[in-house]
């Protein structure tokens, strides 16, 4: 397998996704790893039990199934180790709890995922951690926000719902000069299109619920760390007793095999629709980093290899008093798009993004923000469905 591992390092992404994670000959040649259903692990003797020298000691600390997924993620991320947790949000909260303490100051991008903000404003505040939000366009200017007690920077690129890009290498360089750890939610791009650890990030976070699963049927998160921060992350996870289930790990590993192909379709279809939306009278503007018209497009072009299937547009409105009514009319007229909060699955989804919680990066004021998750349906059918939405909104 070592010869194969060496070959895979320089192979294309779909070849790597097909083969990473486990050696079939570790399991008598079976192409997929076993799903181990056991919480208890037996020891051969009292000495082994006392020293815990064997590889597996208890179900929460790993199984052959969960290890196969962790090894696959490490191969994709270039990380020293990965933990599995029950959801994408848990993948955010665990490193926070592992790397900050009472009296610390943390910097969090203002375009952050809403539930992450809620965690920061409630749980971290109760624990005595001060959170300050920064503008996603700040780049190296983040230096002015650092204090002697700043211990962590949490980034998310692109931003949630409005998709602002960040200068991740510049932010990471500043943070490291001040001795702060940098973590990033990279769910949008996945390691297929962006590898955070290659750009200075210490801890990479993914909601595997999204593209790694691809079928809207699994909840799971992964957190991957570089060598400097791996032991502390692993300790935090063990102390908190949070782990991913073997069945879920198996399904995510299964999803990885086709993730590259699915992402190609999501990327191609979403960008096609985003370009089609630009310049329409129904649309005030399109928020997609891969569009040359997008303000931080240059950062996407510099750092990312592609884009996923989720973006937003601002629905044209005659004034703020009609904004919500137009958004609801648009959404209620859709028949192929479902109305749902998640993304990364095979099906297209839409929602009205509420951005009133932002404190630094103000939300668009020229109309309601409609977020689209573009699935794998035929683009012509999705465009026809969007036309139905526009017709309904124009009648308001």
Swiss-Prot record:
Entry-linked InterPro entries: Cys/Met-Metab_PyrdxlP-dep_enz, Cys_b_lyase_bac, PyrdxlP-dep_Trfase, PyrdxlP-dep_Trfase_major, PyrdxlP-dep_Trfase_small
| GO biological process, alphabetically ordered | L-cysteine catabolic process to pyruvate; methionine biosynthetic process; transsulfuration
Gene3D superfamilies linked to this entry:
Aspartate Aminotransferase, domain 1, Type I PLP-dependent aspartate aminotransferase-like (Major domain)
UniProt keyword annotations, A-Z: Amino-acid biosynthesis, Lyase, Methionine biosynthesis, Pyridoxal phosphate
Name the pathway it acts in.
Answer: Amino-acid biosynthesis; L-methionine biosynthesis via de novo pathway; L-homocysteine from L-cystathionine: step 1/1
Q: What is its EC number?
A: 4.4.1.13
Task: Decide whether keyword Transcription regulation is in the record.
Answer: no
Q: Which cofactor does it need?
A: pyridoxal 5'-phosphate
GO MF annotations for this entry? Answer: cysteine-S-conjugate beta-lyase activity; pyridoxal phosphate binding
Matching entries from NCBIfam families are given as: cysta_beta_ly_B (TIGR01324), PRK05967.1 (NF004626)
Role description: Catalyzes the cleavage of cystathionine to homocysteine, pyruvate and ammonia during methionine biosynthesis.
What is the protein's given name?
Answer: Putative cystathionine beta-lyase
Q: Upper taxonomic classification of the species?
A: Bacteria, Pseudomonadati, Pseudomonadota, Alphaproteobacteria, Hyphomicrobiales
